[in-house]
Amino acid sequence: MAVSFQTKNPLRPITNIPRSYGPTRVRVTCSVTTTNPQLNHENLVVEKRLVNPPLSKNNDPTLQSTWTHRLWVAAGSTTIFASFAKSIIGGFGSHLWLQPALACYAGYVFADLGSGVYHWAIDNYGGASTPIVGAQLEASQGHHKYPWTITKRQFANNSYTIARAITFIVLPLNLAINNPLFHSFVSTFAFCILLSQQFHAWAHGTKSKLPPLVMALQDMGLLVSRKDHPGHHQAPYNSNYCVVSGAWNKVLDESNLFKALEMALFFQFGVRPNSWNEPNSDWTEETETNFFTKI
């Protein structure tokens, strides 16, 4: 049995196929609807973050003392006390009083001279790259631009480098020498040198912030005064180097001793002191108000 399938309309050939195959462009339109979620204030969590406070004259860590600073000051003070004890014990044993007293006075006088020579040297020679003492040279020379910072430094921060040097110098002397006159001189000299940076800081202080005793000693000429020392911070920055009593400043400045030493070093080694250079922004004083305004 044969079955035949017939359609009403017979099949026709497809003749409407496009001959070119160009790209088809389709335009799609998207719409986005946003909704504002309702905040649940009860579930909000505030995360606490530690934020560094802005730098100020009261929290600058470079002006604060560390335990290392304090230990060096304690070590230096101990060696000075040991030297002074030897002078007292020796004085009792030998029944000498006038000579040790004169030796103490000589130590005080020469401490002022020593502070001036040292201050002149570190102000004029070397810099941050100088081995061993580079950091101290940089701080001393930078003091001309920011002189007021010395009044913000804590005592041990301001004095530990001197105390460290005193420890290494005076300790061997204590062990090797017992002469009471020698120790009268050494203990007084070292004591004044140890405190010289504090005397220096007081010379930059305002009258309202200084203890009455300090002001009295300054007025008597026993400590470097607030009136005389500021001349050191005026161009050409080549005077008033002594910072214990300041008694040697007039002698050294009028005799031109430091200028003669500078000439000798220049002709011998070809090294120019900083005081010969034209004043620039590195040495021009910037006031405390202007400095903290920039921070």
UniProtKB/Swiss-Prot annotation:
Annotated transit peptide: 1-29
Membrane topology: Multi-pass membrane protein
Coiled coil stretches, renumbered: none
Domain of life: Eukaryota
InterPro entries per record: Chloroplast_FAD_CarF, Lipid_desat
Gene Ontology BP term (one): fatty acid metabolic process
The EC number(s) this enzyme carries: 1.14.19.-
Pathway: Lipid metabolism; fatty acid metabolism
Principal location listed in the UniProt entry: plastid
Residues passing through the membrane, by range: 72-92, 102-122, 175-195
Keywords: Chloroplast, Fatty acid metabolism, Lipid metabolism, Membrane, Oxidoreductase, Plastid, Transit peptide, Transmembrane, Transmembrane helix
Enzyme class at the top of the EC tree: oxidoreductase
Disulfide bonds: none
Location within or outside the cell: Plastid, Chloroplast membrane
Gene Ontology CC: chloroplast membrane
One term of GO molecular function: oxidoreductase activity
Protein task: Fatty acid desaturase involved in the production of chloroplast-specific phosphatidylglycerol molecular species. Catalyzes the formation of a trans double bond introduced close to the carboxyl group of palmitic acid, which is specifically esterified to the sn-2 glyceryl carbon of phosphatidylglycerol.
Family named by the database record: Belongs to the fatty acid desaturase CarF family.
Protein name according to UniProt: Fatty acid desaturase 4-like 1, chloroplastic
Origin species: Arabidopsis thaliana
